[in-house]
């Protein structure tokens, strides 16, 4: 599934804001609830049983039974993306386009920094094989041992944005 024109236009508009802004638009979508994560204001268990809220936020700070506001969800996402940036930027040893970095932030937000740090994707980035790195996103479509169509779609969109800097 290709990226919708609305998401594409929102990502293009976010480019001047940098990689975190790009990742945020990918995750939330142009309408705030039509992105790669969607939004749920009440905590729930994801497909692998992890307590989750808002745009995919996980952690001990989630209050079961609480209904989160849109502002609280956006604040959690901004905090989480800043954490992603702090966690993975030291491992990226070469200059990469902000669009590539934004696609990677969205990916790492979904799979976790630990998985990124040991990935072929990171190795390819540091070898300045940006296309090869972006192509690696297609390998990350499983959760709980099962391949998910939603993850396949997400990775194609992240890959497309990741490759924008190559065009």
From Swiss-Prot:
Class in the EC hierarchy, top level: hydrolase
Highest taxon, organism lineage: Viruses
Pfam families in alphabetical order: Phage_lysozyme
Keywords of the record: Antimicrobial, Bacteriolytic enzyme, Cytolysis, Glycosidase, Host cell inner membrane, Host cell lysis by virus, Host cell membrane, Host membrane, Hydrolase, Membrane, Signal-anchor, Transmembrane, Transmembrane helix, Viral release from host cell
Signal peptide residue numbers: none
Enzyme Commission number(s): 3.2.1.17
UniProt xrefs under InterPro entries: Bacteriophage_GH24, Endolysin_T4_type, Glyco_hydro_24, Lysozyme-like_dom_sf, Lysozyme_dom_sf, SAR_endolysin-like
Main localization, broad class: host cell
Catalyzed reaction equations: Hydrolysis of (1->4)-beta-linkages between N-acetylmuramic acid and N-acetyl-D-glucosamine residues in a peptidoglycan and between N-acetyl-D-glucosamine residues in chitodextrins
Membrane topology: Single-pass type II membrane protein
HAMAP family according to UniProt: ENDOLYSIN_T4, SAR_ENDOLYSIN
Job description of the protein: Signal-arrest-release (SAR) endolysin with lysozyme activity that degrades host peptidoglycans and participates with the pinholin and spanin proteins in the sequential events which lead to programmed host cell lysis releasing the mature viral particles. Once the pinholin has permeabilized the host cell membrane, the SAR-endolysin is released into the periplasm where it breaks down the peptidoglycan layer.
Record text about domains: The signal-anchor, which may also be an uncleaved signal sequence tethers the SAR-endolysin to the membrane until the latter is depolarized by the holin, resulting in the escape of SAR-endolysin from the membrane.
Family per similarity comment: Belongs to the glycosyl hydrolase 24 family.
Protein name from the UniProt record: SAR-endolysin
């Amino acid at each position: 599934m290709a990226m919708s024109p609305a998401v594409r236009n929102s990502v293009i508009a976010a480019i001047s804001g940098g990689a975190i802004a790009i990742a945020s638009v990918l995750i939330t979508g142009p309408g705030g609830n039509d992105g790669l994560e969607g939004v749920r204001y009440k905590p729930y268990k994801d497909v692998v049983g992890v307590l989750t809220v808002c745009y995919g936020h996980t952690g001990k700070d989630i209050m079961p039974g609480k209904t989160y506001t849109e502002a609280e969800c956006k604040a959690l996402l901004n905090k989480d993306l800043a954490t992603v940036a702090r966690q993975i930027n030291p491992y990226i040893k070469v200059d990469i386009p902000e669009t590539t970095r934004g696609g990677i932030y969205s990916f790492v937000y979904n799979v976790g920094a630990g998985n990124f740090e040991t990935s072929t994707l990171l190795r390819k980035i540091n070898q300045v094989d940006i296309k090869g790195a972006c192509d690696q996103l297609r390998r990350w479509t499983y959760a709980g041992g099962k391949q998910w169509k939603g993850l396949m779609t997400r990775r194609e969109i992240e890959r497309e944005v990741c490759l924008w800097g190559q065009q």
